[in-house]
Structure formats: structure tokens, C-alpha cells
Amino acid sequence: MKIRPLHDRVIVKRKEVESKSAGGIVLTGTAAGKSTRGEVLAVGNGRILDNGEIKPLDVKVGDVVIFNDGYGVKAEKIDNEEVLIMSESDILAIVEA
């Protein structure tokens, strides 16, 4: 299934992050907590400004981002994969290689 977000919405797939405890034990899954990093899968056309113009989004498909995993971020299952739908304003940073 193909999904196309509207306006300033962004579709992100959460990246799993491996964590280690203070004792060096590798934590995975729920013990490691949810990652707030992900890869952008799709972006909307942009935010509609008060004057009616459309401002393109700063993020693009393929960007790795750090996001705020709170109110307003919606999890959905698409083709048996969980993706997150959020506004661009929920994205805090783009991770540059």
C-alpha cells in the first residue's frame, strides 16, 4: 500500500536502537525503550501559511530524524509495518552522516 501524507505531515519508520546497561548488557526491545529516531518514508506538500502560500518541508524522504514521541504522533500499521504519522514540527533534528 502506498501512503501520501497531507500538508505538513511526515511518515516516519522508527529505527531500532541497541542500548547497553551500565553493566554492559545489551538491552533490546522494551527493555531498551522506544527509539526517537527514524527514517522519513514520505512527506506532504508543505505547510499552508496564513497568506495561502505553501512552504515546502525541510525534511525529505530518506532523512534520518530525531523526533518528539509525544502527543500528536500517531502510530499506524501499513503492510504489517508500524509507521508514525507526525507534523514536521514534531521533528527536532535531521541526523547528518
From Swiss-Prot:
Subcellular localization(s) per the UniProt record: Cytoplasm
Top-level taxon in the UniProt lineage: Bacteria
One GO CC annotation: cytoplasm
Signal peptide from the UniProt entry: none
Stored SMART domains: Cpn10
Keyword Cytoplasm part of the UniProt annotation: yes
Disulfide bridge positions per record: none
NCBIfam families, alphabetized: PRK00364.1-1 (NF001526), PRK00364.1-2 (NF001527), PRK00364.2-2 (NF001531)
Annotated function: Together with the chaperonin GroEL, plays an essential role in assisting protein folding. The GroEL-GroES system forms a nano-cage that allows encapsulation of the non-native substrate proteins and provides a physical environment optimized to promote and accelerate protein folding. GroES binds to the apical surface of the GroEL ring, thereby capping the opening of the GroEL channel.
Family: Belongs to the GroES chaperonin family.
Assembly description: Heptamer of 7 subunits arranged in a ring. Interacts with the chaperonin GroEL.
Protein name, as recorded: Co-chaperonin GroES
Organism of derivation: Yersinia pestis
Gene, per the UniProt record: groES
